[in-house]
Amino acid sequence: MAANKVIFEHVIQPGTGKAVEVRAGQILRIEQVEGGQCVDFNCFNLNDYKEFMHCGRTRTVHGFHPSKGTFLWSGPPRERAMMFILEDTYGRNDVLFPRCSAYLYESAYGFDVHTNCQDIQAEAQREYGLTPDDVHDSFNFFMCTEVSGPHRAQITRQESRAGDYVDLLALIDVLAVTNVCGADVMRTSNFSLKPLRLSVRPATDAERAAAPPTPILRSQRTPESFRVRNIKADRELRADPTYRPEFRNVPLTVEDVAVELSANEMAALAAVRQPIYGDDDGAALRDVLFSWWEERFLAGSSGAPVISNKADSP
C-alpha cells in the first residue's frame, strides 16, 4: 500500500465525534475545515482499553502546551508513548483544562441541555463498548491557554485557519477518539462550532523514523505483572477475603548517617536552609543535599524520562 494513500476519511460535524482504529505505523490527521475549532482528543490501547492517553503524565513530560516533536503518554503503571506528534501547523495545544461536561454548562451557564465533550466522547466510544465512565480528560488540540496569575489559568481566543492540521503517528495500535469541542459559549473556539476532517494513512519510513526512541524500563508494569489480571465485571466493590498485602519495596529501613559540619559549613547551611524545618538540622541538610542533586543529576525535569533524538546520537 502506498504510504501516502488515505485509507480512511471522515468529517465530524459540530456536536459529534468519531472513534477510529489507527494501527501502529499509521498517521491520523486532524484538520481544520473552516478554522478556529478546538479538538478534544483521546486514545486507548486498541488491545487493552485500560491503557489510555494520560494528560497528567503527558503534561509532566512535555509541559502545558505539547506540540510537534512530543508524545502522548499513557499513565502509570504502563507509562508508554502511545502516539507522536509528527506535525502541528498551528502549534497551540493544551493539557491543562479538563473536558467540558453537561454539569459545567448547567452549573456555570444555566443550560440544562448543551453540547459538551463528555457526552460527545461517551457516544463516540460507545461504538466500541466503552461507557461514559471510561471517558478521560482530553488532549485539547488547537486550544490556546495561558497561566494568567498565581494559581490561575485561562482560555484565550485562537487563530487557526482552514487547512491547519495535526499529524499523529501511532506507536501502538490505538482507538483514537476525536470530537468537536462543544464549547460555543467560551473563547475555546471563538464562540462558535465548526466541523473537522479526519484521515488515516500509512506513514513513510522517514516519518516512522522521526519519532525518537523512548526508554523501556524494568519498572514499567504490564498486565502480566499484575496480581489481579482480570478486569472487574461488576460495579459493586467488595473486599476479597483471601487478600493478603504484598506491597513492593517493604519493609522500609531508615539509617541515620552522622555528618559533621564545621562552623563555616553550619553558617552556609543557615544561609540556605528552608524555614519549614525549624531547628531540625538533619532535615534541613537533607533538603539541601537532594535539591543540589536534583539540579545537577536528575535525568529529566519533574521526573520525566530522558528522550534522546536519533539525530543527536553519535
Model-derived regions: residue spans:
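Short, basic amphipathic alpha-helical segments that act as recognition/interaction helices
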Residues: D279-V306, D312
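Acidic, Ser/Thr/Pro
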Residues: M1-N249
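Short Lys/Arg-rich basic patches
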Residues: R244-A268, R273
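Amphipathic alpha-helical interface segments used for dimerization/assembly
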Residues: V20, L28, R273, L289-W293
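Hydrophobic beta-strand residues in large extracellular and virion-surface proteins
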Residues: L28, A176, L198, V259-L261, ...
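Short hotspots in intrinsically disordered terminal tails
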Residues: P251, K310-A311
